[in-house]
Amino acid sequence: MGKTMSVNYQQYYLHQRPHGPATDSDVRVRAVEVDGLNDGQLLIKNEYFSLDPAIRGWMSDEPSYMPPIELNAVIRSSTVGTVVESRHPDFAAGDVVYGLNGWEEYSVSDGYFLTKVPKDNRFPLHYYLSAFGAVGLTAYFGITDAAELKAGDTLLMSAAAGAVGSL
């Protein structure tokens, strides 16, 4: 493990599995310290976090398209943040990235599931958690590929369609 700046921060973790709607007793906050990065890792200061309906499903111990969040693990979600230190060949300090990290002030990442925000970005960064992120891509491909809508077709979207349906 290489020497890096020491960072103390807060993270939200899954304390217990919810039964019904999630409550504040299911999630707790703890202090975490990072004092080194391995080769291939980067440290991200998270600036935006998603709060998507899928997170509640990940809190359950049910198989899904994503594995359940383990007890005592950080709550997984999409984030947007700035790389503050990197030992990864594809990312440099100052890069703005979005991807799957967690509800924490900082994330240590191996770069998997991370995408750089273009340097010439002119859009608010939170767009990368909605229209430009997984939610937006799901909505786009749902309409263009799965639904195969054509000119003149009518689309009715339920208010219960969630984040994807809102796009």
List PLM regions with ranges.
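Short, Lys/Arg-enriched N-terminal segments with co-localized hydrophobic residues
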Residues: M1-T4
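Short structural boundary motif marking the start of a folded domain
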Residues: V7-Y12
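Short polar catalytic/cofactor-binding loops
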Residues: H15-G20, F49-L51
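Short glycine/threonine/proline-enriched tight-turn/helix- or strand-capping micro-motif at secondary-structure
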Residues: P21-E33
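Glycine-rich beta-strand-centered segment in the early N-terminal region that forms part
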Residues: E33-L51, M59-W103
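NAD(P)H dinucleotide-binding glycine-rich loop of Rossmann-like/cofactor-binding domains
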Residues: S77-T82, A93-A159
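N-terminal Rossmann-fold NAD(P) dinucleotide-binding loop
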Residues: G165-S166
